[in-house]
Amino acid sequence: MESTITIENVVASTRLAEDFDLEKMMESGLEGAEYNKVKFPGLVYRINNPKAAFLIFTSGKVVCTGSKSIGNAHAAIINLANTLKSICCEKIDLEPDVRVQNIVASADLKTNLNLNTIAIAFGLENVEYEPEVFPGLIYRVEAPKVVVLVFSSGKLVITGGKCPEDCEEGLRIVKTEFDNLGLLY
């Protein structure tokens, strides 16, 4: 019943400049960019290699989402920095400090789970289970600080990690606790 995580999304942020003129950026030919400051204060820009989406703000800050690895998120941000430098922004940090804000991963225990039994066995301390509201059980792991969504199909979503190891450890903790309680069948 070995299970490992699959990274589904990495959210990373950085500061590429002191500030950005988003109107100028739109006029400079950033293909596919979307900016409507009435709807959202940032410019939205997507790339395909590596696949990522960016939220670019006037403060010079950038949020990158949609990458499947930390390396791809970092590469995407460097690509963005080079693109912006070449089309409109001279004062760009080409070696920015990239910080991972969140990793979302999935895993499959490859067995069906009785969520009512799990909720009763774990009590109310770190678990929320309201099937009328949400079909999964929400299990909060304290260290590392991750949240594991557990579904009756045995599929899990692990979120809140700052590195893949946080998600792996969250999975290991949940599997160990389920196994110790005899809940994996």
From Swiss-Prot:
The keyword DNA-binding applies. Keywords: DNA-binding, Repeat, Transcription, Transcription regulation. GO terms for molecular function: DNA binding; DNA-binding transcription factor activity. Sequence repeats lie at residues 7-84, 100-178. GO terms for biological process: DNA-templated transcription initiation. It comes from the Archaea. The keyword Transmembrane does not apply. Coiled coil: none annotated. InterPro entries: TBP (IPR000814), TBP_CS (IPR030491), TBP_dom_sf (IPR012295). It holds the Pfam family TBP. NCBIfam families: PRK00394.1-2, PRK00394.2-4. General factor that plays a role in the activation of archaeal genes transcribed by RNA polymerase. Binds specifically to the TATA box promoter element which lies close to the position of transcription initiation. Belongs to the TBP family. This is TATA-box-binding protein 3. It comes from Methanosarcina mazei (strain ATCC BAA-159 / DSM 3647 / Goe1 / Go1 / JCM 11833 / OCM 88). The lineage of its organism: Archaea, Methanobacteriati, Methanobacteriota, Stenosarchaea group, Methanomicrobia.
